[in-house]
Regions:
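A conserved amphipathic helix/loop scaffold
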Residues: 1-180
Length: 180
């Protein structure tokens, strides 16, 4: 789990992943981007040096899933490490990009080698209106979302209030958003 910045949803990811004893979570949160100058010495920003080379070069094939959570390309991870993630996916690995408006920004992961394997391209439009996502016909049969409707609370799932507009470039649509 690579978190681009601290936020409340980060705790949800941690709790979800740590709730399964079979998951060995490695979590990296960027507390301060390199361009921010706040007077805190670099050696005081973490308890240990994060082993990025070890994780993104030597041990990348050992992961079942790599999650980028609100991650931006701000010089923290070298482009060569992102290229390693692309190769990891091409060789059968899995990546999940959980993003908000930053997905359409100039420092988006989409503007990196990762774009080669992403099924959507951001339009830079952010739709900010209430909507309820719906499972598509394909989504009702797909192993990722099959049975999800049965798990919905009485009255259905809550509304979502933001969607990043994208153009589908590959893959299959399992859920529809604000405008169908």
């Amino acid at each position: 789990l690579v978190s681009g910045e601290p936020h409340a949803g980060e705790r949800v990811w941690r709790n979800l992943l740590k709730s399964d004893a079979a998951v060995d979570l490695v979590h990296f949160t960027i507390l301060r981007p390199p361009e921010k100058q706040d007077g805190v010495p670099v050696d005081e920003l973490s308890l240990i040096a994060f082993p990025t080379r070890e994780l993104f070069v030597e041990k990348i094939k050992e992961f079942d899933l790599i999650i980028f959570d609100r991650y931006r390309m701000r010089g923290i991870l070298p482009t060569s490490y992102i290229e390693n993630v692309v190769n990891y996916v091409r060789e059968g690995g899995t990546v999940l990009v959980a993003a908000g408006p930053e997905f359409g920004a100039v420092d988006s992961l989409y503007r990196s080698p990762l774009a080669e394997i992403l099924p959507v391209a951001p339009t830079a439009q952010v739709i900010e209106e209430g909507f309820r996502p719906k499972i598509t016909d394909l989504g009702r049969r797909h192993p990722v979302t099959e049975g999800l409707e049965k798990e919905a609370p009485e009255g259905g799932w809550g509304r979502w209030f933001r969607q990043i507009e994208v153009e589908q470039t590959a893959g299959q649509v399992l859920m529809s958003g604000a405008h169908g």
